[in-house]
């Protein structure tokens, strides 16, 4: 699995270069399905979350990334496509399956990367998933 390979090969390099400061790490150790809700300020945010989480984190990413080799690459990283321009029911169902299977789902509630560094308007997907699944939302 590409996710595991990247995580263990690149984690030491990541920790040396990025030197992340983590608060409330035990909050990430929740059992069962959980939603990691994170601000999205950098393209490296999903990588940082994956490296810092004690569990495998599943993500959605814009469907435009799933062309050609991107499809196999992102699927190997536990990422599935979402159409950000519609209410993508299939992607929400897939996220629900991840949570019902007791896994961790990472989501960026704004639905996109912030260009200003400020919090943008939140999309409804995070609240919908939390209410429908009963999974706890862990802010990061």
Predicted regions and their residues:
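Soluble catalytic domains of membrane acyltransferases
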Residues: 7, 16-140
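Helix-enriched interaction subdomains in cytosolic or periplasmic regions
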Residues: 1-6
């Amino acid at each position: 699995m590409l996710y595991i390979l990247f995580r263990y090969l690149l984690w030491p390099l990541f920790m040396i270069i990025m030197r992340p400061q983590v608060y409330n790490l035990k909050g990430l150790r929740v059992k069962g399905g959980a939603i990691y809700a994170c601000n999205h300020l950098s393209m490296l945010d999903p990588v940082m979350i994956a490296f810092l989480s004690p569990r495998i984190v599943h993500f959605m990413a814009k469907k435009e990334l799933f062309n050609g080799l991107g499809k196999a690459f992102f699927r190997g990283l536990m990422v599935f496509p979402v159409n950000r321009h519609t209410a993508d029911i299939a992607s929400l169902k897939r996220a629900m399956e991840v949570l019902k299977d007791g896994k961790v789902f990472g989501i960026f509630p704004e639905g996109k990367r912030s260009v200003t560094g400020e919090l943008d308007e939140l999309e409804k997907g995070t609240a919908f998933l939390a209410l429908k699944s009963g999974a706890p939302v862990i802010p990061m």
